[in-house]
From Swiss-Prot:
Its main location: cytoplasm. It is found in: Cytoplasm. Coiled coil: none annotated. One of its GO terms (molecular function) is acyl carrier activity. The modification O-(pantetheine 4'-phosphoryl)serine is found at S37. This is Acyl carrier protein. The gene is acpP. 4'-phosphopantetheine is transferred from CoA to a specific serine of apo-ACP by AcpS. This modification is essential for activity because fatty acids are bound in thioester linkage to the sulfhydryl of the prosthetic group. It comes from Hydrogenovibrio crunogenus (strain DSM 25203 / XCL-2) (Thiomicrospira crunogena). Pathway: Lipid metabolism; fatty acid biosynthesis. The lineage of its organism: Bacteria, Pseudomonadati, Pseudomonadota, Gammaproteobacteria, Thiotrichales.
Amino acid sequence: MSSIEERVKKIVVEQLGVEEDQVTADASFIDDLGADSLDTVELVMALEEEFDCEIPDEEAEKISTLAQATSYVEANLD
């Protein structure tokens, strides 16, 4: 697991209040981890803060798993 993926996973665990072993690469934040729309907004905000980046709304809507969040951050880090 990359350090970026570990950091993203830590944020998901903290924001959604789930156990670390529940957060797999393809677990859906909403369907598998019980997040609602507010949770996903707060999750994106936490990712933006952690990685000092801005995630446009149209991109944020596409992020629904750990793998997608990690891929987005890796592709958009300076």
